[in-house]
Amino acid sequence: MTDLSRSADTLTPARVTTAFDLPGHTTVRSLGVAQGIIVRSRSIVGSFGAALQTIFGGNITLYTSLCEKAREQAFEKMLADARKLGANAIVAMRYDSTEIGSGVTEVICYGTAVCVTPDA
């Protein structure tokens, strides 16, 4: 017997998928959209360092690091939002980003918060 109200504690990154269902599980309840939003800006030092990296071409590691951190933070906020809803899984997870202003970017991570039970 599974207590769905207590199973929200089992929401881990392994129970987040971009698919519309979680393999090996049955969705028993949809709880709505879970989301995490983070707005990041580049520092003057970071912008200068990245500008220097563009001269040589290739991966701009300063921006890559900033983007990775923003995505991680948005993901963690989405998990926290899903836990508040009582979810133990998230399906149809997506990322999106928008430049709000010069050097200011919004990153959103969202998906459908659900309660699942393992298939028999």
UniProtKB/Swiss-Prot annotation:
InterPro entries: UPF0145_dom_sf, UPF0145_YbjQ-like
The species this protein was found in: Burkholderia vietnamiensis (strain G4 / LMG 22486)
S-S pairs: none
Family, as annotated: Belongs to the UPF0145 family.
Lineage summary: Bacteria, Pseudomonadati, Pseudomonadota, Betaproteobacteria, Burkholderiales
Highest rank taxon of the organism: Bacteria
Name used for this protein in its record: UPF0145 protein Bcep1808_3406
